[in-house]
Design a protein with these regions (language model features):
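Amphipathic alpha-helical interface elements that mediate macromolecular binding in regulatory proteins
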Residues: 96, 134-139, 143-147
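A short, structure-level motif marking secondary-structure boundaries and short turns
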Residues: 114-116, 120-123, 165
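Intrinsically disordered, low-complexity regulatory segments in eukaryotic proteins
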Residues: 121-131, 170-175
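Alpha-helical bundle/repeat cores within regulatory domains of eukaryotic proteins
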Residues: 120, 128-139, 159
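Residue-level signal for the start and early helices of compact helical domains
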Residues: 89, 136-137, 175
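Ankyrin repeat (ANK) tandem alpha-helical domains that serve as protein-protein interaction scaffolds
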Residues: 4, 163-185
């Protein structure tokens, strides 16, 4: 008797995905197909070829800079606190579905959409990414974070450099070797 074939796509195929993940992928595919110029931008940032902003800058902006400097984004008639938005979206989607970096199962991004499964590059592959990274870029686009990052890239980079410098100056835990004699009378 043959065994049932087990999916090797790490919960990214329609057999394994829950309805939330499935609808998320369909929405992402629709978004990126209808915004090809933004897909080109995502490709340049994800591959490190964008000379204005990087993944590290975007991540730093959302996770640390926004918290330290109370960054607000103005959208239509609303004022949104960036760090609070980021934390709320992260808690509702988890790192599995929302992450600036490629830490999970890879997917192929082509001109025709996102291809799940084996992420080996083919002729029509634009770049390799993850669903979580594509969701992060979609979130940044929808909230105007990319524009904010491009306008304030020098301040964000400076803050990141000064933070790294501060961390390097902090003394690390020191191990002190000495003899101790304990006498019990």
């Amino acid at each position: 008797m043959r065994q049932k074939k087990v999916c090797s796509l790490c919960c990214l195929c329609s057999l394994c995905m829950n309805s939330k993940e499935d609808s998320l992928i369909r929405n992402l595919q629709y978004f990126y197909q209808s915004h090809p110029s933004y897909l080109t931008f995502v490709q340049s940032v994800a591959s490190g070829k964008n000379h204005t902003i990087s993944l590290r800058i975007l991540d730093w902006l959302c996770t640390s800079y926004a918290k330290r400097h109370n960054v607000v984004i103005f959208q239509k008639d609303r004022v949104l606190h960036l760090h609070t938005m980021y934390k709320a979206f992260l808690s509702s989607h988890s790192k599995k579905l929302f992450d600036a970096f490629r830490r999970r199962q890879r997917v192929q991004v082509t001109k025709s959409g996102v291809i799940l499964g084996d992420a080996t590059e083919s002729e029509d592959t634009l770049f390799i990414s993850t669903i979580a990274q594509l969701m992060f870029f979609f979130w940044c686009y929808e909230r105007g974070i990319i524009e904010y990052a491009e306008e304030n890239v020098n301040a964000i980079e400076s803050d990141l450099r000064s933070y790294v410098k501060e961390k390097q100056k902090e003394p690390s835990a020191m191990v002190v070797h000495s003899k101790v004699v304990v006498d019990f009378d």
